[in-house]
Amino acid sequence: MKKNFSRIVSIVAFSSLLGGMAFAQPAERGRNPQVRLLSAEQSMSKVQFRMDNLQFTGVQTSKGVAQVPTFTEGVNISEKGTPILPILSRSLAVSETRAMKVEVVSSKFIEKKDVLIAPSKGVISRAENPDQIPYVYGQSYNEDKFFPGEIATLSDPFILRDVRGQVVNFAPLQYNPVTKTLRIYTEIVVAVSETAEAGQNTISLVKNSTFTGFEDIYKSVFMNYEATRYTPVEEKENGRMIVIVPKKYEEDIEDFVDWKNQRGLRTEVKVAEDIASPVTANAIQQFVKQEYEKEGNDLTYVLLVGDHKDIPAKITPGIKSDQVYGQIVGNDHYNEVFIGRFSCESKEDLKTQIDRTIHYERNITTEDKWLGQALCIASAEGGPSADNGESDIQHENIIANLLTQYGYTKIIKCYDPGVTPKNIIDAFNGGISLANYTGHGSETAWGTSHFGTTHVKQLTNSNQLPFIFDVACVNGDFLYNVPCFAEALMRAQKDGKPTGTVAIIASTINQSWASPMRGQDEMNEILCEKHPNNIKRTFGGVTMNGMFAMVEKYKKDGEKMLDTWTVFGDPSLLVRTLVPTKMQVTAPANISASAQTFEVACDYNGAIATLSDDGDMVGTAIVKDGKAIIKLNESIADETNLTLTVVGYNKVTVIKDVKVEGTSIADVANDKPYTVAVSGKTITVESPAAGLTIFDMNGRRVATAKNRMVFEAQNGVYAVRIATEGKTYTEKVIVK
């Protein structure tokens, strides 16, 4: 009782010193609205920071009650034993090659005397209990100077696909531990500008364009990014996925690849043994890099199939990582490619992961009322040393509130003390579409509830599968000697039907306490569309962008967490949050074999419409202004059926047949009684006693002749028809 009374007195007395600044328990926080881009020019950007929601929490130390400061978006990265002084960070797009500098243009501050700031506990692992780690005052408390010293700094430059960036860090709290003086900067304005010197970690753009699929990411990560900075590639580029699969699973992956192409994601297969034999991490890394650097720059996803012994993770001291395969440009930890894994030890393990993924994207209907229900799980630990000074329960409550505001209809909260495996089993079996876990973990279980791999067989949530954002130690250690927690959930099935989860992000190592909380916050904010410039619809996109925010704020520790936070499942999975609604889709029932385009009307802008032929993509387009105009990239044969597939966020997938009719330019004749030659723009056709006709790609007849024809063409694709001796031949001709 005496301890609590001292804490309250400390807060009240200290509050009066700052004239209205609050000293209280941690509050719900989002992005700091007081950080603004004042100007952005070719070689310089100005950024303004203003203090927002400064709060203090009293904690008991060897020197009595000391204060732990927090403010909106402030992050404690102070070294162990030094004063806890949060910083705030923002990323800027910078010169591709020049070194940058930061200068303070103006600042305002107030000073308060006789303030004891608590020492940092450093980076705390989730294998530990923060409450059992004492506050230890280090050597810095004997130094008569302000910490950390500079109020604005730049981190090392990084590269995110086609854009070079740099983080500007604001340190608005400066503390002299000898005089016990706290300097509070209420406003800081900085200019970040190019210098004449060559920079580090530079980038050379081989073309004046960026891949459209990353535009929203650039806008979200870089506060000064403009889409007009480069000329985007055509929007038809919906990205590309490569599935790297061991030879033994090559045939088993076909249904998955066919579906991905059918729903509009160009997907290819690469047999792992064709990359290297034996398969090594270095070989996988080099292969992904080579594919990324191919013309078009459209590689977006890589799915690894198999366990560690089939396709190894990259192992370096303290790191077991799949994510590094997607870190290609520069020497930083920002992924250019989203990485996921179907971890399997048998064909059955693989089949259930394929089945659950296809069903989730293709077969969900308006009757799937389990969507829109979520599970939040938290330990009873955490507090001042955690992200935003939140306990795990406070953290999950903030997430629960966010989900409710977005439209989730039911939130199940399982908070320690007292959570049991049955609580988790009942939540899964009752139907949930999302689970957030924040707490302790082991290779095979969650610490809160002790729900683990031995309980997975009790799950009966057949094809009612949530995806999971998991903050815990080693739940994703797929190098462990038995299937880890994440693997068990992805392989789970009951009576041959998938149970468990459709995707989970889980760590291969002991996670830090604070930094993954920031990543988890951002994942949920992206999911709930809190950032208009960063709308992501795939599991890989949501999770990786959440981790980008973690790296920006927590620097080196954030990088380590990103490298080891592993996606189990398809990184291109189109996530669902709420009960889907139907789209109104209309399209012709027939298409000419010589058509160049196919138009689809749809009442949901942003939907993806795709024509495919037995798992081969013919063309795809995004719905804009109520229609999608699909350009046909592949030739189509007449008298066949194509499949029109339309997918959309929280929509019922639409699949229709489209019959091909008319003259095909795909039937190329060889060794026939005619010759067709192209010289420049001249098409010459010769055949004795034959009728000759040329059609353009729209099926229009543009030229006719007998026996011999010379036609001056424009650039394009043409069909040449030769009718002779009672037979008709058709040949495709390209004029460039």
Swiss-Prot record:
GO biological process: proteolysis
UniProt subcellular location: Secreted
Positions with a binding annotation for Ca(2+) 3: E390, H395, D521
Signal peptide: 1-24
Enzyme class of the recorded protein, top EC level: hydrolase
Residues the record lists as binding Ca(2+) 4: E522, E525, H531
EC number(s) recorded for this UniProt protein: 3.4.22.37
A molecular function GO annotation: calcium ion binding
Binding positions for Ca(2+) 1 per the UniProt entry: D307, F478, E487
Catalysed reaction, written as an equation: Hydrolysis of proteins and small molecule substrates, with a preference for Arg in P1
Activity modulation comment: Inhibited by human histatin-3 1/24 (histatin-5).
Keyword Calcium attributed: yes
Active site: residue positions: H440, C473
Protein name according to UniProt: Gingipain R2
Species for this entry: Porphyromonas gingivalis (strain ATCC BAA-308 / W83)
